[in-house]
Amino acid sequence: MKGCDVMPNWTHNKIICKKSIAEKLLTPVEDTYVLDFNKLIPMPNELDLTCGAIEDMSVACYYYSLDDNERKKVKDLLFNTKTDFYHNYWNKYSNDINRLLNGSLNINEISNNYDSSDDKMKEKYSSIYDLGKRYVDNIKDYGFPNWYDWRIENWGTKWNVDDEVSVIDIDKNNYEIRFDTAWSLPYGIMLKFSELCKDNEFHWEFQNEDFDGYHTLTKENGKIIDNVTGYDEEYTDDEIEI
């Protein structure tokens, strides 16, 4: 499983586009640029929550605090909301929920540990129950509990680019934009960006760190075409540099 804290392989991306189109993706900052995927597909602020153990435990605590009627509503929501790897969110959270229900986890100890921690989320969520409710509400409102799950589905990668971008002024009309993304081509971002371009304006190249060829994406009759060249299992690092 490719988790939120796992160090990824990188995908190297290069876009060549008109400067007027690049402005939809880039933000000038002093003498450089920031590339923010939120300009194309904004992530709701409520999803800016930690993923991992604190998520699982806080959802379990919130569920534990509810009466039987509310528990059923939450269980139905979690069970009917699909997610990769676990298939649905009930499968993801049910282990900790069951450990609370059978007494192998102590709810008061967990709550006190959260209260005495320096977790940054305490600034917004004063108790572990409030935090768990936020995760559940996010699933209800957005289909995902946290930034990681939402970005993987909507952007196609887990991290933003920000200032880790190179912008080359090719000529008076065009930029070359280079940046890396975690694990894969940011597929959702690529598709959204392609909507800004006419067929002859769209040009996106990418290479995966585990090298499966040089990919050049173009647009023909509104459809994205992936042209792959240079695939060779016996590659070296200098052969995969864009």
Indicate residue ranges for each PLM-predicted region.
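Long, contiguous binding/interaction regions
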Residues: 3-242
